């Protein structure tokens, strides 16, 4: 959505972006980018743990989940700011909230109507929570990035790449992990 609005504005179109959450979408806020920060921390932890196998005499004095979360969140906020500045620079109006279609050329948000010849819909995705007993005690992959404390133990349910990546991050940073899969192995659609 942001790239489309910025590109259209660069060609002279009058554009607006309506966003109910933080700018940048799923990838920047609760997907690719924060996951890569966590994955890099996990890889660093793994390297430190195996350093003695390569002749290094180091001691590891612990890991601070809160510090990593704080730095990761600050990095994401910086990216949100960059996106806001780019919209402003390109004269794309940023409207906080969500809208509904009235007809093919009209949307409404908070009682105000906006008309346009064309709309680009880039809604992103949301995790689906199963309708099973106890589901309220779990978190989605989005919730992983909201954890204020590092859990001592987790059960990650899923066999796809997101579940396997998050299980790997937890494990490398010292959390005891159980990966629960429906089939006979993880990443079955990727092997």
Name each region found by the language model.
Residues 1-17, 156, 162-172:
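N-terminal Rossmann-like FAD-binding beta1-loop-alpha1 element of flavoenzymes
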């Amino acid at each position: 959505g942001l790239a489309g609005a910025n590109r259209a504005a660069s060609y002279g179109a009058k554009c607006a972006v309506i966003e109910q959450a933080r700018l940048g979408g799923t990838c920047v806020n609760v997907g690719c980018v924060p996951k890569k920060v966590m994955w890099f921390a996990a890889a660093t932890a793994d390297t430190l743990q195996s350093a003695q196998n390569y002749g290094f005499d180091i001691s590891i004095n612990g890991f601070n989940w809160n510090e990593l979360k704080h730095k990761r969140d600050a990095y994401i906020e910086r990216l949100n700011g960059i996106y806001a500045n780019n919209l402003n620079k390109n004269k794309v109006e940023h409207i906080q909230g969500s809208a509904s279609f009235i007809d093919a050329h009209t949307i409404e948000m908070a009682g105000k109507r906006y008309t346009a010849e064309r709309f680009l819909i880039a809604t992103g995705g949301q995790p689906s929570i199963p309708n099973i007993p106890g589901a309220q005690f779990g978190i989605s992959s989005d919730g992983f990035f909201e954890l204020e404390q590092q859990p001592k133990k987790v059960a990650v349910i899923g066999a796809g790449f997101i579940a396997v990546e998050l299980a790997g991050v937890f494990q490398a940073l010292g959390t005891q992990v159980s990966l629960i899969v429906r089939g006979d192995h993880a990443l079955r659609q990727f092997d």
